[in-house]
Amino acid sequence: MQIEDYEQVYALWLTISGFAIRSVDDSKEGVERFLQRNPGISVVAEEDGKIVGAILCGHDGRRGCLYHVCVDPAYRRRGIGKDMVVHCMNALHKEGINKVSLTAFTQNDVGNAFWKEIGWTKREDLNYYDFVLNKNNIIRFNR
């Protein structure tokens, strides 16, 4: 994926149910920052010049993560999603990454079935937490 793909990818994201977009992280600037930090790892799938699938993929030097995995519903069940995942996994492996995670909404039945189908393991032994950091709450972490 290149930043030039952003408009088509963003339009695709808007068509996917069970998907969440954040205005800051998923802005063009946010995605460009992510792609610069993780060059050559994210991927798009194209059919006749149209982007029909995308994965934002990156790592922190220790663990990999897949974000915003999506395939246009009209193009599903053709192996596009699996091919994109294989691309990302190979790219991460070349970077020395040996463990990869992702987050899927509990009620995203299509997505959850896909991950199980291609051999991913759903973790039952941990809780997932996040914290939306902004200028108003950063003071919690100042001494």
Kindly give the residue locations of the regions a language model identified:
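A short, internal acetyl-CoA/4′-phosphopantetheine-binding micro-motif in the GNAT/acyltransferase core
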Residues: 46, 69-76, 104-105
